[in-house]
């Protein structure tokens, strides 16, 4: 005896929502997206052409697809045909994958996702799921949608560009100048640009045209030296126009693309080659990637941004500048604890708990008793000198100023040993401002409240990366270009937020 079923019979009810459980994710997505103000969608309205799909419907379908770990436009279109929950969101419309992909990178999409995050943050605060008082910040590297062997290195570019300049100088002096009447003077101090080379090519073409005209007007029987000169001019013209100028233009475009970086990918020029944690070959191979920075509370991503530089130190200040709410407390690991970051946060009167590079080592008993610890040295305030536990004296000599890669000015006091030959180190370099900032930070981190808040960081921000990589399968970007990657990552993080929001609201 089996349960009766018939696939050819019409069934009731016909509303798709009645086939879905009441706590299904699509109802939460629909509620969150539909409550957005219509003004946020004005960029998607057009006064011409056939009626377009509603942007709220398209955003909802993208968020649901991303929440299921599906990122391909063709697979999203397939979901609209086969998936009942997706059919509920689309009203049983089937949107072409081309439309989906075009909408995903549309002009107003980045601003729309930003507004979606702001709206969800306020909703979470109203429902007391977050307070917006404390930001837990961390970063991860996501592999770019680029060929792993499409790298361009800054040092190699500078090396080959310098070689090209040498070749041009020699070639112009030996081959070009003797051939033409108009003398060409090259600046040996400044590099020759591709525009200058094209101008030289124009001069050569004019010279060649004059020579051709001269040969036609006054032909010579037998051997003609002018024809030999014409062959040489044609050869030189090809060299300048098709070789030197092309290579010079390529190196110039490379230098413009670097934008302070040491590498980029030809496939996705905004991506930088970074050392990834997933190193299956165990050879430290670099891959084109982006640095994703997120700020969370209660495992909800409140803010995110994408950077092309691999280190977290230089990302903190620009990341916080784009945060849409009031900054109160920032919690981050040792990758963010630079002098500039700590100083700027103090100037903005933002509370912060940020480890610095030596914090964990300073708490160990061996370091506290070590002679390397400056706390164990005797400091003479009058003479401005430090005395090593074994008796060597280091006296103040001068102040050294240096700039970081972000043009931040550091002031370092230099001390030299009285007996440099026998002393364990000849000099001592002291950044007093940074030492004071670190001492203040150490006191805050070791306080009972500081310990409690900082311990929360590991279970707040780091699980989010595991969820989007392991649960949603987002380990590689689906789009190319920094702007498009920012949209792509925003959809993934928002989908992860909505999964959590749906689960927690239905539990309550």
Q: Could you say what each language-model-derived stretch is?
A:
Residues 1-27:
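Hydrophobic alpha-helical membrane-insertion signals
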Residues 2-4, 62, 70-82, 93-508:
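Anion-binding and metal-coordination hotspots
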Residues 13-14, 44, 85-87, 128-129, ...:
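Short hydrophobic "helix-edge" motifs at membrane interfaces and signal-peptide entry regions
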Residues 21, 49-57, 68, 72, ...:
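Generic, well-ordered alpha-helical segments
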Residues 22-63:
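Basic, short loop/linker segments at the boundary and entry of helix-turn-helix/winged-helix-like folds
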Residues 34-42, 66-71, 82-89:
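Short helix-loop boundary/capping segments at the starts of domains
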Residues 48, 86-91, 122:
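Catalytic micro-motifs at enzyme active sites that drive phosphoryl/nucleotidyl and oxygen chemistry
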């Amino acid at each position: 005896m089996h349960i009766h079923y018939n696939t050819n019979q019409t069934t009731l009810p016909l509303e798709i929502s009645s086939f879905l459980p009441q706590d299904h994710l699509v109802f939460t997505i629909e509620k969150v997206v539909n409550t957005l103000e219509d003004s946020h969608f004005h960029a998607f309205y057009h006064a011409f052409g056939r009626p377009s799909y509603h942007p709220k419907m398209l955003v909802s379908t993208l968020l649901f697809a991303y929440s299921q770990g599906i990122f391909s436009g063709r697979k999203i279109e397939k979901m609209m045909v086969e998936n009942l929950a997706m059919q509920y969101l689309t009203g049983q419309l089937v949107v072409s994958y081309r439309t989906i992909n075009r909408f995903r990178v549309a002009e107003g999409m980045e601003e729309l996702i930003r507004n979606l995050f702001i709206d969800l943050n306020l909703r979470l605060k109203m429902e007391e799921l977050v307070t917006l008082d404390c930001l837990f910040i961390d970063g991860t590297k996501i592999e770019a949608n680029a060929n792993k062997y499409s790298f361009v290195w800054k040092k190699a570019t500078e090396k080959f560009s310098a070689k090209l300049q040498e070749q041009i100088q020699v070639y112009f002096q030996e081959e070009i100048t003797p051939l033409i009447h108009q003398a060409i003077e090259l600046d040996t101090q400044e590099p020759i640009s591709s525009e200058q080379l094209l101008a030289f090519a124009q001069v050569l073409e004019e010279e060649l045209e004059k020579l051709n005209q001269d040969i036609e007007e006054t032909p010579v029987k037998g051997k003609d030296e002018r024809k030999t000169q014409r062959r040489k001019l044609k050869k030189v013209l090809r060299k300048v126009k098709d070789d030197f100028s092309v290579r010079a233009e390529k190196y110039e475009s490379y230098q413009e693309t670097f934008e302070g970086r040491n590498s980029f990918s030809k496939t996705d020029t905004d991506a930088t080659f970074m050392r990834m944690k997933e190193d299956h070959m165990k050879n430290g191979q670099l891959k084109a990637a982006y640095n994703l920075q997120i700020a969370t509370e209660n495992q909800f991503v409140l803010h995110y941004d994408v950077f092309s530089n691999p280190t977290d130190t230089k990302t903190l200040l620009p990341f916080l500048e784009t945060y849409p709410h009031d900054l109160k407390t920032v919690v981050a690991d040792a990758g963010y604890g630079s002098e500039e970051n700590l100083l700027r946060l103090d100037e903005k009167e933002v509370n912060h708990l940020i480890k610095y590079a030596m914090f964990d080592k300073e708490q160990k008993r061996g370091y506290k008793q070590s002679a390397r610890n400056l706390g164990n040295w005797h400091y003479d305030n009058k003479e401005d000198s430090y005395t090593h536990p074994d008796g060597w004296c280091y006296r103040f000599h001068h102040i050294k100023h240096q700039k970081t890669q972000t043009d931040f000015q550091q002031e370092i006091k230099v001390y030299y040993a009285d007996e440099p030959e026998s002393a364990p180190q000849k000099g001592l370099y002291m950044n007093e401002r940074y030492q004071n900032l670190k001492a203040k930070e150490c006191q805050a981190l070791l306080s009972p409240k500081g310990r409690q808040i900082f311990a929360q960081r590991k279970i707040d921000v780091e699980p989010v990366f595991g969820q989007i990589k392991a649960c949603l399968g987002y380990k590689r970007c689906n789009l190319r270009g920094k702007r498009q990657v920012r949209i792509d990552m925003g959809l993934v993080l928002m989908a992860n937020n909505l999964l959590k929001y749906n689960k927690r609201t239905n539990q309550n």
